């Protein structure tokens, strides 16, 4: 029985399908502002490839736009777990903490974004002591 469950979990992963759903979700978000539909597509992207750090990242960005800040943070954290040098994910963690009125945590993530090569952070880092 456990072997069947393991087989299903591995066979249910489909990186190509994940990429298609991710691209669709990003298009719906950026071109049409269809946030609910975009979230559904990005949910499927994550379902089909649990290692697709870009899908978690884009879903995090979408959820910030939807004011689902805690869920966005979880997505950015997952993206960072999968790709520890993901500078844009650190930057967006910082932006999200600003929206949650937590400047100290925001500064931590802005500094990490800078450490991993995110350009144009001077204005953000000036707020940090």
Give residue spans per PLM region.
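Conserved structural position within tetratricopeptide repeats
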Residues: 43-47, 77-81, 112-115
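Canonical tetratricopeptide repeat
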Residues: 58, 92, 124-126
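Terminal, low-structured helical/coil segments at or just beyond the last alpha-helical repeat
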Residues: 104-129
């Amino acid at each position: 029985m456990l072997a069947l469950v393991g087989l299903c979990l591995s066979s249910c992963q489909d990186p190509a399908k994940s990429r298609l759903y991710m691209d669709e979700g990003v298009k719906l978000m950026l071109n049409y502002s269809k946030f609910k539909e975009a979230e559904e597509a990005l949910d499927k992207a994550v379902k089909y490839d649990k290692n697709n750090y870009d899908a978690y990242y884009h879903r995090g960005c979408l959820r910030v736009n939807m004011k689902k800040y805690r869920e966005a943070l979880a997505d950015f954290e997952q993206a960072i777990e999968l790709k520890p040098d993901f500078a844009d994910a650190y930057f967006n963690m910082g932006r999200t903490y600003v929206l949650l009125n937590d400047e100290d945590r925001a500064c931590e993530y802005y500094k990490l974004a800078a450490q991993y090569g995110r350009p144009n952070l001077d204005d953000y880092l000036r707020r940090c002591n």
